[in-house]
């Protein structure tokens, strides 16, 4: 009986995803609901807002390992919770 219980515990541990995987929004629009599971090592969600270009306002969302620096006429927001880059 102990062997069966130990086997069940081991199978459960192997089958569970013990690591936490961040999910972020990834669409290039102002309002977004497309969710993406970030890769291992990507622990931040980012949202980049480009202002004043010829195409109007543009958004870029996704996952990142580090928070990028904003370039001129750009706003960058980084966060570390699921879907926090809305």
From Swiss-Prot:
What the protein does comes down to:
Three-finger toxin that binds and inhibits the muscular nicotinic acetylcholine receptor (nAChR). The neuromuscular block is irreversible in chick biventer cervicis, but partially reversible in the rat diaphragm preparation.
Q: Which Gene3D superfamilies match?
A: CD59 (2.10.60.10)
Cystine crosslinks: 24-45, 27-32, 38-63, 67-78, 79-84
* Matching PROSITE patterns: SNAKE_TOXIN (PS00272)
Signal sequence interval, chain numbering: 1-21
- List the keywords (alphabetical): Acetylcholine receptor inhibiting toxin, Disulfide bond, Ion channel impairing toxin, Neurotoxin, Postsynaptic neurotoxin, Secreted, Signal, Toxin
Secreted among the record's keywords? yes
Where found?
Answer: Secreted
Gene Ontology cellular component annotations, sorted alphabetically: extracellular region
Q: Which organism is it from?
A: Walterinnesia aegyptia (Desert black snake)
Question: Where does this chain mainly localize?
Answer: secreted
- Pfam families, from UniProt? Toxin_cobra-type
Q: In which tissues is it expressed?
A: Expressed by the venom gland.
The record's comment on protein family reads: Belongs to the three-finger toxin family. Ancestral subfamily. Orphan group II sub-subfamily.
Record-linked InterPro entries: Snake_3FTx (IPR003571), Snake_toxin-like_sf (IPR045860), Snake_toxin_con_site (IPR018354), Toxin_cobra-type (IPR054131)
Molecular function, one GO term: toxin activity
Instruction: Quote the protein name from its UniProt record.
Output: Three-finger toxin W-V
Does the keyword section mention Disulfide bond? yes
């Amino acid at each position: 009986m102990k062997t069966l219980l130990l086997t069940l515990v081991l199978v459960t541990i192997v089958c569970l995803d013990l690591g936490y995987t961040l999910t972020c929004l990834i669409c290039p629009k102002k309002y977004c609901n497309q969710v993406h599971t970030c890769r291992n090592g990507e622990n931040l969600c980012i949202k980049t807002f480009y202002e004043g270009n010829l195409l109007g306002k543009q958004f870029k969302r996704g996952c990142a390992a580090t928070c990028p620096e904003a370039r001129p006429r750009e706003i960058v927001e980084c966060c570390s919770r699921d879907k926090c880059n809305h």
